Design a protein with these regions (language model features):
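Acidic, glycine-centered active-site loop in nucleotide-sugar glycosyltransferases
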Residues: 276-284
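C-terminal "capping" alpha-helix adjacent to the active site of nucleotide-linked donor transferases
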Residues: 285-307
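Generic, well-ordered alpha-helical scaffold segments in large soluble proteins
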Residues: 237, 299-302, 318
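Conserved phosphoryl-transfer motifs of two-component systems
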Residues: 263
Length: 347
C-alpha cells in the first residue's frame, strides 16, 4: 500500500483533462481496484508519497509556478517522494529531485527519476474492428505495414522548419512552456525511411501515405473510416513501422502492441516504459536510424517460427496490461514498493 497526499482543492470538474492520470482514476472514476494499492492521506506527515495534482505545464501557463515549487519543496523537506506529471508532446523538466511522469523525451537527457508512460488505449479489436485477435504465421519475407503522415516534398521540410521556429520563439518569449528539442522533420524523414523499405526487394510493404494528420478528415464519418483503415493495416501485417512524432515517442508503438503485432521501432534516442524492469527486445525490434533495414531483415531471418507467434501473443497480453491506466499504475505501485522487481512475473 502506498499512502499519498495531494492538494484535493484542484480536483474539480474544470481540471478533469489536466489531472495526474492516477488521480483521475481515484478521484474522478472512483476506481476501487486502484484504491486497494493507493490510499489518500489528509496530511503530508502521514504520507510516504506526495503527488502534484495537475499537469505541471498548467502552473506555468497560469503563472502559478510559485505555488508549484512551494508545494514540492515542502514535501522534499519532509523527505517525501514527489510525483509530477507533464503532458504535451515535449513536456517540461523541473530542477527538483522529483519523479516525472511523461510520454516521451530523450534517453540521453533524462535522469533515473523520469518515468515514461505508455499511451492509454481502448482495445481496438472491441471498439473499432469488432474482430478477435489472430496470430499471423511467419513467412519467408518480412511484411510490414504503416498508415500515417509522411511527405517527401521539400515544401513539407521547410513548412516543418517554420513551425519549429515559431514554436521555439514562443518558448523563448515564455508564451509556451516546454523542454527544448532539436529540429526533426518528422514527415520528411518518415517518408525517406518508408521509401527505403519499399525499394528493398527483400521486404514486403503495405504502406498508406497521408499528406496530413488523419488524411485531413473533417467529419465524424471520415474519422471513423480513417480509424478503421489504420487499425486494419496493423491487423493485416505482423510488423508495424513505428517512428517518433512531434514528441520523441510513438503512439503507434502501443497500438501495435495492444493488437498483438510486432513494432519495428526506430531508435531516435528514446526511452520505453519500465526500461529497467523488463527486456523490450523480446517485444519489439529496436533498429538504428543508419542501419534499420539490415537490422530488421536480420531479426526476421533469425526469428524462429514458434517464437514469432509467441511474440505476438505476449505483445497482446503486454499491451492490454500497460496501455490500461488502472493496470499500469498497479504495476507502478509494485515498482515503488520494490525498485528491483522483475515485471515479467506480472504478465
Amino acid at each position: 500500500m502506498i499512502n499519498y497526499y495531494t492538494d484535493k482543492s484542484f480536483l474539480i470538474p474544470e481540471n478533469r483533462k489536466r489531472v495526474f492520470p492516477l488521480l483521475f482514476q481515484i478521484h474522478y472514476l472512483k476506481n476501487e481496484n486502484i484504491v486497494a494499492f493507493y490510499q489518500v492521506q489528509n496530511s503530508i506527515e502521514t504520507a510516504n508519497l506526495v503527488i502534484v495534482p495537475l499537469d505541471i505545464i498548467y502552473f506555468f501557463n497560469t503563472k502559478t509556478q510559485k505555488w508549484l515549487y512551494n508545494f514540492i519543496d515542502e514535501a522534499l523537506k519532509k523527505d517525501k517522494k514527489v510525483w509530477v506529471y507533464t503532458s504535451d508532446d515535449l513536456g517540461i523538466t523541473l530542477n527538483r529531485p522529483v519523479y516525472t511522469f511523461r510520454f516521451g523525451g530523450f534517453e540521453s537527457k533524462m535522469n533515473d527519476k523520469t518515468i515514461v508512460m505508455p499511451s492509454f488505449l481502448e482495445d481496438p479489436y472491441i471498439h473499432v474492428l469488432n474482430k478477435k485477435f489472430e496470430i499471423i504465421p511467419k513467412l519467408l519475407m518480412p511484411k510490414i505495414g504503416f498508415v500515417g503522415q509522411a511527405n517527401g516534398a521539400l515544401i513539407t521540410y521547410f513548412r516543418e522548419f517554420l513551425i519549429y521556429l515559431n514554436y521555439n520563439f514562443k518558448i523563448l518569449i515564455k508564451k509556451h512552456h516546454s523542454d527544448y528539442q532539436p529540429f526533426y522533420p518528422i514527415g520528411f524523414r518518415r517518408f525517406s525511411k518508408l521509401k527505403k523499405m519499399e525499394n528493398d526487394t527483400e521486404i514486403e510493404t503495405d504502406f498508406i501515405y497521408r499528406k496530413k494528420y488523419r488524411d485531413g478528415v473533417k467529419t465524424s464519418l471520415q474519422r471513423q473510416k480513417s480509424t478503421v483503415t489504420f487499425f486494419e493495416n496493423i491487423f493485416n501485417n505482423p510488423y508495424t513501422f513505428c517512428m517518433r512524432g512531434g514528441g520523441n515517442f510513438s503512439v503507434r508503438f502501443y497500438e501495435a502492441l495492444i493488437m498483438g503485432r510486432i513494432p519495428v521501432v526506430l531508435n531516435t534516442d528514446i526511452r520505453l516504459p519500465f526500461y529497467k524492469n523488463m527486456d523490450w527486445n523480446i517485444h519489439c525490434v529496436l533498429v538504428s536510424e543508419n542501419n534499420f533495414l539490415d537490422e530488421f531483415k536480420n531479426f526476421h531471418k533469425q526469428c524462429a517460427d514458434l517464437y514469432f507467434e509467441k511474440m505476438q501473443v505476449e505483445n497482446r497480453n503486454l499491451g492490454l496490461k500497460i496501455c490500461n491506466s488502472e493496470s499500469y499504475f498497479i504495476l507502478i505501485h509494485h515498482i515503488f514498493e520494490d525498485f528491483n522487481c522483475n515485471l515479467n512475473q506480472f504478465f
